[in-house]
Amino acid sequence: MEAILMIGVLALCVIFLLSGRNNKKKQEARELEDYLEDLNKRVVQRTQILSELNEVISNRSIDKTVNLSACEVAVLDLYEQSNIRIPSDIIEDLVNQRLQSEQEVLNYIETQRTYWKLENQKKLYRGSLK
């Protein structure tokens, strides 16, 4: 009788130990899954940062033939496709501005075109000639 009781107690101890190990393995698996999820989030963040940096680099890269950045050349190509001529003064000023995005370049050119249009519409005051 005592032998059967001892075998039963040993069986319960073995089951308890195995279930404890199983719980530890489940806990470790959950921790590893959380760690993997955190690493995946970091990879996504780093990929976004890398793509933003690559975009900035491509916008800042200078075309050696015309001495303008890629975004400036793209905007000037849009004007050329639309058969709109840009005065050389605006292009010369554009070289010195070093604008970062195509929208900034477009806004700058439009502002300068408006300014030059107003300047060219000025007339000489009639009273100045005598």
Swiss-Prot record:
Principal subcellular localisation of the protein: host cell
GO annotations of cellular component type: host cell membrane; host cell plasma membrane; membrane
Keyword Transmembrane helix: yes
Domain of life of the source: Viruses
Location in or out of the cell: Host cell membrane
GO molecular function, one term: DNA binding
Site (Involved in dimerization): R113, W116
Signal peptide: none
Subunit structure: Homodimer; homooligomer. Interacts with DNA; one dsDNA binding subunit is constituted by three p16.7. dimers.
Protein name: DNA replication protein 16.7
Organism whose genome encodes this protein: Bacillus phage phi29
Gene that encodes the chain: 16.7
